[in-house]
Amino acid sequence: MLACIKGRMLDLFIRNAMRVLAAAAIAFAFCVPAAGSHLVTGNGFGFAVVAPENGVATKFYPHPYSFVRPDPAKPLSEGIEAANFIKTLGWGRAGQKSSAQYVDDSHVIRMRTGGSAGYFFMPFGFEEPALIINLEGAPRSGAAWKVEWNAPLRSQESVSAAGAQGRLLRFDGIDEPLLLIPLGTLRKVTGSDQLLASRSAWALISLQDESQAISVIRKFESWRAGLAPSALVAREIAELEQWRTQPTVHFRSDKERHLWRQSEVMLRIAQSREPNLADRHGNGLIVASLPDGVWFTPWVRDMAWATVALARMGHRAEARAALLAYFNAQPTGKMRSEVNGADYQISVVRYFGNGEEEPFFTMEGSTNIEFDDWGEATWALGEYLRLYNDRSILKAVTYRGPLYEAARNFIVKPLMANTEGYGGGRIVSADTSIWEEHQKDKKHFAFSTAMAIVAMREFVKIAEIEGDDAGRRDALANLALLEKGFAAAFIRKGELHGTLEEGIKNDIDGALIPIINFGIVRDPEVTRNTIERMSLLKVVSGGYRRVRSNYTDPAIFEYWYERQEFLFVDLALAELYRTLGRKSEAQAMLTRIVDKAAADHNIIPEMYVALPCKLFPGEIGDPTGALPMVGYGAGAFVLHLLEREHRGAGEQAALKPSATRTSRP
């Protein structure tokens, strides 16, 4: 009976989706948005990127991250890069006017070029790195797919199964074979070496090796269930609507609602669903940005914000998978010699796609140590437990044993092992912290100690859930020491400072705002003073940068990077304004971000241009940096709206999960 009800509901969703597609086609013809940012689709197994200004897809990655594993020949490099199959994939002529948009705030991309329209999407229901392309009305318009591969085609052969005949392609320099399965009717093509021109619709599926071809064709045909390409598009949108949770916030505008829905999808796209294997342990990891953003690598810190956003939205399964990813990623503890000999589980920076710790991020080929990561991972675990009371996760078997024991022994203990006595309490040892300073410039950052305080607050409750009285007492004692040390080290003469060390760069620091939002600082005069000094970080684009940069050499990346407007700081400050009752100012800051996103496919970028340059070109206020941004973009926006609801309607109504899912479809 339940299956029958679900089936009828899906049929209804599909019929509605077909109407949405029809309406979108009409609207698309009359209301074409500016080209804007590149659009990305993904399904947790890979990514594809569409460039509206060129009318083509420009990337198809067979993995949901940028770097697969370390490069043994270059241990301090960013690693072995994920393959990309295509250079261009489209149907129009060079110079033709093109545009693209997401259909109904989904991951399905509809593009119009030269009077024809087509779809690109990676289906969540088919658990392989697969890209579906469908060109509408191709026989009537004469439009046909054209592809330029990103590497020389080495060989191709026919392969058949389940009544479908595909082509298996191999490329020079790419390990993964590419399987092509035709979906549309056969077209007569003369004088063309373009294989894709023979059909209006295709499935492009990356394989681990060619031996998978037959089984993947059968799997695909089972998933397809005989549906026409247009029906596959409609079903994908309908299934996505079933996955969504009911928002627990009151939107102030349609723009807010659309940005919430698109952000929800961005968070889903960003999470790896690749199964763990003997040499791969990245299932559940979340990248910091989506391509073409340069940060489509799993960062501990950004992932924490994305995880908490998913949890608070009601996406329990995705949040749980992210937490398990923290504890199953391996090998970790690579920098043990740099952290007082303490073994640890959570990476000190980020991860390769295979789940291995990557502590190398400064772009100069040297290592970083970011202790705040350990605090943020513990915060995410505590938030999840508070929302769902899922005690079973603490018993889950992970890389280093039961999850609770791994958290206690390989997060809390190494964190406290990397603290120093100060002012009768303790502070976290010098590191590179939230803004990823170069290791040679490490300092005692307020943010790292603040996140250690958050970690101990959370672990007090986690230990209580587990029934570990000794662990709870230790966490309480550590908490008291850290709070005392923080007050002595970072609040000096009534002013909150970003570092223990004196210096103009971090004297006022955008990271101080989330510290106050976390409730680490409660003195209203200190808060008022901090807000007043934030004027020193105001930039001409209208928002705030992270720090006052002290770089003097324009040849250095950070010289330009640190002079741009940083949206994570904007959203944090707007939240603080709202807490203090400055609601109109808070809403104005939020509305500005929402309006800018609405003009750019509801994509939230890392930054806005405040100082145009070659690295960050454009007009003042244009989106720049990594985009779409995930944890610091979609996640931060979602959390801001949830916090606004909490301030206006009470915590229980705002944060209680609604319509949660218990499995990841």
Task: Label the model's feature ranges.
Residues L2-I5, L12-N16, V20-L259, V294-T297, ...:
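Terminal accessory carbohydrate-recognition/targeting modules of carbohydrate-active enzymes
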Residues S37-A82, W295, R350-D373, A377-T378, ...:
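C-terminal capping/lid segments that line or modulate ligand- or cofactor-binding pockets
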Residues A100-V103, L277-A288, G314-R426, R592-V630:
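Helix-terminus loop motifs that line ligand-binding clefts
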Residues T245-R252, V265-I269, A304-A317, G365, ...:
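Well-ordered alpha-helical scaffold segments within catalytic/enzyme domains
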Residues T248-L290:
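Conserved oxyanion/phosphate-binding beta-strand-loop segments in alpha/beta enzyme cores
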Residues R257-R268, T307, R316-F327, G375-L385, ...:
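Hydrophobic core segments within long, regular secondary-structure runs in both alpha-
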Residues V300, P331-P359, N368, K443-V454, ...:
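Extended ligand-binding clefts on enzyme/binding-domain cores
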Residues A417-I465, A475:
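Internal metal/ion-chelating core segments
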